[in-house]
Amino acid sequence: AHNLMSYRHTRAHNSLLVNGIGQPYSTEGYGSVMRAMGGQHISYCLGDASYAYRGISNDPMWVGYFKQAGIEQVPENGFGATPLTKYRRHVLMLHPHTVIVYDELEASEVVRWEWLLHSPTEFKIDATKKTLSTNNKTKGLVAVTQLFGGHVFTLSQTDRFVVPHTIT
């Protein structure tokens, strides 16, 4: 169950959930790279995931895995249709240490957007400045993320999986 609900699910990949729903495990939900360029000082990529959140997984292999795990592909489990109409992600890297992610998001109705950002170390959250920072002392890496948006949003973190990992 952990493999389907956490490891493979959109929620595990620094992406968005729309009303708690991620992408299906299906070729019917897809994305594409619209633009890409790389240079000595700057790199850029534009991805379009507008069609990536399209219903449930209907591939017989995945249907079998869900059945075997006793998991229904319903919104409460993060699967189903969404009113998403536009999801374009711009990623700009100013070499060597700055990455800017800008998402263009639209839906046909009011939705709850969730951006799930992952780190092997705990985030320090400053809700006033809308920043998250993390320091991985083992690897010698520091990351600071500042969030901008046109709507009020909340910041939170957890160290829990939707379905805990079990060793069998």
Residue ranges and their predicted role:
Residues 2-168:
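CBM-like, beta-strand-rich accessory domains located in the C-terminal region of large
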